[in-house]
Structure formats: structure tokens, C-alpha cells
Amino acid sequence: MGNKIHAGFTFTPSHARSLDCFVCLLVLFSFRSTPPHGRHPAIEPTLLISHYYRGQMLGTYNGDSKAETDGKDNSICHICSDVATGRHYGAIACNGCKGFFRRTVRRNYEYHCRFESKCEIDKHNRAVCRYCRFMKCISSGMRDDQVQSERDVIGKREKKDNMKTYCQDPTPRTSPELTMSPVEDEYDQLLESLLKSEMTIQSLRDTVITQTGNVEYTTKSKNRLSHTDRTATLNDVLKSMHSQLLLVIEWAKTLPEFKQLSGADQAVLLKNFAGQHVTLCVAYRSVGANDALKLLNDLYIPRASKTTPHLKEYVDGFYLRDCEKVMDQLVEPMRFLKLDNKEFVALKACVLFNPVAPGLSNHAVNLVLNARRKIFAAFEKYVRVNKPLETTRVGDLTFFILTPLSVLSKSISEDIMFTKVSGVARIDVLMEELILAETDYGEDRQDQTPCSIMNDTPSGSQDMCSPCPEDLLRTSTSSNSPTNSSLTAGLLLKTDDAMMSGIGTQYTTPQPHTPQFADSSHLNLPYAPFTSSYNQYPNTYS
């Protein structure tokens, strides 16, 4: 055969494409290693065969290969464009994509794409969307029928050894798959319980409003463009704040971790938390408002620039000079980040359980720290599962909301203190105990018995003492039912108008099932908080 080949003919890779093993043997025995007539060098037979098999490995000589049709470089992976290591399962691929395809087929994994199966797969983000990566493996030529069954002898031996250890160890153990599910469920139940606590307070508030019967509800649409006709007065603001302080105590008593603490430690947490609670709640309630702060009683504190001329003087001299800071530093971030209900209740509970609150006992510090860690872990898990694309959301919520909260709440406490010392308004004992705890005045009162301080009232009016935190914490809350009437009985719901506007008011403690008020005309109970939220409870939140 070699004697009949023209001396000027030279084999090229295109000629070698059709060679098989038999032809390679013929070439090996037929070709001469010396050039005929000394004109053209003859191809080395061993190099020809080596080149042939190398082409088979890289797909150069495969007529079905995509490398010839689409011009792809066989040195890069056709899936992620990383450095290819050869043909794996029918496609030019790297070791990473080869292993990914093998694991997916062997373990019957099912993936789903969140972006309409249009993810771009490259070596930098190939692990972002497994569905699109697997589909690209298939479109690049990988075949699942070429994946052999798993033959991991070492892995089987390790599994047998682990089984022997498990059988010999008297301590029961569970696999990670079994232990993760209860933890995930516990986190979900924790957030649900926090929402239930909000529902408990809402149910209590609705019950009292129904029994009172004279609370003023707004007659205008919730989507009204103007709310200047609902501008709050100083008396309205203090009434709303007083009611919110009463309800936050009842909210705290619905939390199991809070009830494990002693009465003294509970009072410490509430004094540290009350001002931040008022600020955080009014900010979250104002997310749906139009450049204003919305109070519990459905009234508004507008910006100074939004007020009418006859209200300008009132706003300029208003004690809440930091209202606009709350709008800018809390309301706007909440609106921008679209803070939802579960995130809000989780952040609120984290603020309550502050392990560095001054005055906590050593035993309470560990309990409070564990409670905060547990709630924050549930918060992180919720964000990770429900908002996976916002990888920095936990940090954004923490820094943009919780960071300015403490500073703003202390500023508001100082504003309230200013109204007291300037004689603009009288502040009741409950506010002094909770809101003014962070001010110099509150620190001077630490050695005084809470309810021994009677508020001055005008002549002719009756002296009275607002319920202090210690008294409210001692009330009975034996049942955890959201609609339990004992909650209504335990809460001394009243608004001390004498402490705010100089008008004497009498009240009686509501009794179980039939709460009664001696003078309900002076009662200004809070409306449902978070009116722009909690859509999952349409019958409760208005």
C-alpha cells in the first residue's frame, strides 16, 4: 500500500479523520520513515496514530461534535467557559461541571429557576442558578445515560463504619437532615408567635374600644391626600403615647422569654425599651402616611413645611422637634426597604431583649441574650428564605433602622422632659417611669418609689396616680389566649387627662368580661397600629 502512494502526498488531520484502529495498523506497517525521492518528509506513523486518538478524546474528529459546527474552542468548558479537561458525558467540560452533572443525575436532584430560565452561566456565577447550569449541560451535549451508577467503595466503607459507631454508641443521634427541619419549624413558629402577640394586643384594644363605644373613628377614606384636618394637638400626642405605654407592657407579658424574668428585670427591660418602642411603632405606622407621623389615635404630626399658616406657630413651638428626623431617618428607610410585618415584629422583639440594659441581673443577662439570638436567627432565616436576592437585607435593616432608633428615642424623651420642666404639659407617673428613664430627670428618680410620686393637679380636681410598670407587671396574665378577658382585666386602661391638660378625670379598673369606665368621655384609646400592614388579618387590622 505504501509503495503505491504518490511520493508528494502527505497525510493531514483531515485524512486521519476516517482512520480506525485497523487503518492505523496498516499505516504503521506501510509508511516509510525516510522521505521518498528526498522531496517531501513522510509523516511519522506513531505521530499520526497519536494525533488520531487525541482528536477522538477532544472531539476533533467526531463528526457530531459542536466544536466543528459552532466554532467553539475545545480548550474551554462549553458550559461555564472554564478550562476544559476533556469530553465528559458527551460534552467538552471542566471538572466542576462534570461533577455537578454527575451528582445531579445520580441523586435525582430537581432544580428551579427564579428568573424565567434566562440566567447567564460562566465560571464566576455558575453556582448561582443550578437549574440553568444543568440545562446548559444538557444543551451542550451531556447525556444522563452515560453517567454510571455510583461506585464509591471508600464512601461505602465509611458509611458502614459510621453505622457501627452509631449502633455501639448508646447516645441516640440523628442525621443533619432530621435535625435541621425541627429548627426551621421552630424559627417559623417563633415569628408566628410574635405576630400572635401583636394580635393579642389588638384584640385587647378592640375589646376595650367596643366596650367604651365613643371612640372617634375617621369618616374619611384612608387614601385621602390631605390630613391637615387631623393634625394632632399636644394633648392628643400625650394621650396616644400613654395608651401605647400601657399596651406595650401587656405585649411584653405575652412573650414566654419575658415571663421567665423576675419582676425587677422585666421593669429594667421595659424602661430601656419603652421610648424606642414608641418611636419604632410610630415610624412603622407612618410608612403609608403622606410626609407625616401617624399616631395611635389616627391623628397626624405633619412636617412644618406642610402646615397651614394658622398651624405654623403651633408646629414651631411643638415639643417634638425631632419628628422630622423620625420621618427622614426611620420612616423613609422602612418605606425604601419595604419592611414587612414579620421583619417588624422580629426587630421590635430584638430591641426589647437588650442584654446590656443597665440594671439587669447576671442571671437575666444570659436569658435575655439567648432570647435575642434566637429571635435574630429566626429573622435571618426568614429573610434568607423569602428574600434570597437581597443578600444584604439583614444588614440594611439592622443599620438603617436600629442604629438611629436609640438616638431618636432619647431625643424624644428629652423633648417630653422639656414640656414638663417648661410647664407646657403635665406628665403622668407612667411616662416618667418609662419615657423619662433615659433622661437626667429619670436618673434622679431611680431611688424613689414609683407610685409614691403623686402628680400635681389643679385645685378642685382629684389627685390620682397613673399605673406604674411594676403594678402592671404584677397583673394576672395566666392565659395565653389572644382573646382572654383576663388581659383586659389586668390592664389599667385610662388616660390621665389631669396630667396632660389640667382637666381632672376619674376612672375605674375594668373587670373581667365587663370592663367599665367611670368617665369614658375623657378616654382616648389607641387605634389599631400598623394600619398600612397586616393584610393577612383583614378582620382585625383596619
Curated annotation (Swiss-Prot):
Bias (Low complexity): 475-487
Region (Disordered): 445-487
Bias kind Polar residues: ranges: 448-464
InterPro entries, A to Z: HNF4-like_DBD, NHR-like_dom_sf, NR5-like, Nucl_hrmn_rcpt_lig-bd, Nuclear_hormone_rcpt_NR2, Nuclear_hrmn_rcpt, Znf_hrmn_rcpt, Znf_NHR/GATA
Zinc finger (NR C4-type): 77-97, 113-137
Gene3D superfamilies associated with the record: Erythroid Transcription Factor GATA-1, subunit A (3.30.50.10), Retinoid X Receptor (1.10.565.10)
UniProt GO BP: cell differentiation; regulation of transcription by RNA polymerase II
One cellular component term from this protein's GO annotations in UniProt: nucleus
Pfam family, one: Hormone_recep
Molecular function terms, GO-annotated: nuclear receptor activity; RNA polymerase II cis-regulatory region sequence-specific DNA binding; zinc ion binding
Keyword terms, alphabetized: DNA-binding, Metal-binding, Nucleus, Receptor, Transcription, Transcription regulation, Zinc, Zinc-finger
DNA-binding region range list: 74-149
Subcellular localization, as worded in the UniProt entry: Nucleus
Domain NR LBD: 186-438
Function noted in UniProt: Orphan nuclear receptor.
Similarity-based family: Belongs to the nuclear hormone receptor family.
Official protein name in the record: Nuclear hormone receptor family member nhr-35
Source species: Caenorhabditis elegans
The organism's taxonomic lineage, starting at the top: Eukaryota, Metazoa, Ecdysozoa, Nematoda, Chromadorea
Protein encoded by which gene: nhr-35
